[in-house]
Amino acid sequence: MPFLGQDWRSPGQSWVKTADGWKRFLDEKSGSFVSDLGSYCSKEVYNKENLFNSLNYDVAAKKRKKDMLNSKTKTQYFHQEKWIYVHKGSTKERHGYCTLGEAFNRLDFSTAILDSRRFNYVVRLLELIAKSQLTSLSGIAQKNFMNILEKVVLKVLEDQQNIRLIRELLQTLYTSLCTLVQRVGKSVLVGNINMWVYRMETILHWQQQLNNIQITRPAFKGLTFTDLPLCLQLNIMQRLSDGRDLVSLGQVAPDLHVLSEDRLLWKKLCQYHFSERQIRKRLILSDKGQLDWKKMYFKLARCYPRKEQYGDTLQLCRHCHILSWKGTDHPCTANNPESCSISLSPQDFINLFKF
C-alpha cells in the first residue's frame, strides 16, 4: 500500500497488512523502507506498486527537465498583445493590479531595442530599473531583464555604437547587484544566490568586451565629416545633446577640437538642458572675464538632471488606461484615441507602478 508524504515526488513508504494491522518494513541491507512486496503481497499488488513508483519517478524527471530548460532559456516571454491595461486597484470587473514586472514582460522590449528610435528609451529604462526597481520584478521579469540586456550588449558589439551608454548601464547594474547580493537571507532577489553571482561574472565579461572593442574604419573612401564646410560641421555638432560627445569628437582631429571649444555651441547646450534660473546659480567666469559655458555645462550636469528627448516613447491612453508603444493599435472606445494618449518618459513609466 503506497503512502505519499508531504513531498508528492517521493516514492512513498512500504506497508504490509498483518494480523496486528498495517506495519512498515525496513530493508535490512539499505536501512530504508522499501517495497519488498514479493514476500508479503500477491504478484498483482507488487506490480501495481512498481507501476506507481515508476510514475512518480517519471513525473519528477519531467519536472527536473523542465526546470533545467527554463534556467537555460535565452528567449523573452512574449505575449500576443503588445499593450497592457494598467489598473492600480481591484474592482468588481477586475481583481488585482498591474505590476512593473508584468508590464516589462508584455511590452516587447526585446524587439524595441532593434529600433533606433526606441533604443535610448529602453536603455534608460533598464538603467532606472537597475538602480532601484530590480527587486520589484518577478522571477520571470528578472530573467527577461538579463536576456534583454544581453541582446543590447550584443547589438552594441556588432554595431559599435552607444558604447559609453552601455558601459554606464552595466556599471550601474553591477553596483546594485553588489549591494543586493550582500543581503543574504533577506529575499531581496528571486533565485539562488549562486545564479546571481554567475550573472555578475557575466556582466564583468561584457564590460571587458566593451573595453576591448576596436572601432573599425569603413572600407569605402568617400566624403567624411571633416570634408564638410565648417558651418555645416558646426550645425551638425549642435545636434549633439551630450557634452561628452562633443569632447570626444574634438579629440578626432585638430580642426574639430577648435570647433568643439566654440562658446556659442556650449551656450546653446546649456540653454537646451537647463533653465535660466539654474544657469544663473552656477555662473563660472574664464580668465578673460567671460562666461565659461563648457565648465558651466559639466557643473550643471552634476547638479541638475539633463533634459531627456527620445525618438519614440511609451504612451498611456487616458481614456482606457492602456499602455503601449506609440503607433501600436489598442482596443480603445474613444472617438479620437490619439488625442487621449500622453507620452511617458522612462521615469514616468516607473512612477506609474509605485503604489
From Swiss-Prot:
Q: Pfam families under this entry?
A: F-box-like
CDD domains found in the cross-reference section: F-box_FBXO32 (cd22103)
| Pathway assigned in UniProt | Protein modification; protein ubiquitination
Which organism's genome codes for this protein?
Bos taurus
Instruction: Show where the record puts the motif Nuclear localization signal.
Output: 62-67
Record's keyword annotation contains Nucleus: yes
**GO BP of this protein:** protein ubiquitination; response to denervation involved in regulation of muscle adaptation
Recorded hits in InterPro entries, A to Z, give: F-box-like_dom_sf, F-box_dom, FBX25/32
Q: Which UniProt keywords apply?
A: Cytoplasm, Nucleus, Ubl conjugation pathway
Q: What is its main location?
A: cytoplasm
Q: Which residues form the F-box domain?
A: 223-271
Q: What does this protein do?
A: Substrate recognition component of a SCF (SKP1-CUL1-F-box protein) E3 ubiquitin-protein ligase complex which mediates the ubiquitination and subsequent proteasomal degradation of target proteins. Probably recognizes and binds to phosphorylated target proteins during skeletal muscle atrophy. Recognizes TERF1.
- Presence of keyword Nucleus: yes
The places in or outside the cell where this protein is found are: Cytoplasm; Nucleus
Motif extent (Bipartite nuclear localization signal): 280-295
Q: Where is this motif: Nuclear export signal?
A: 169-173
Q: What is this protein called?
A: F-box only protein 32
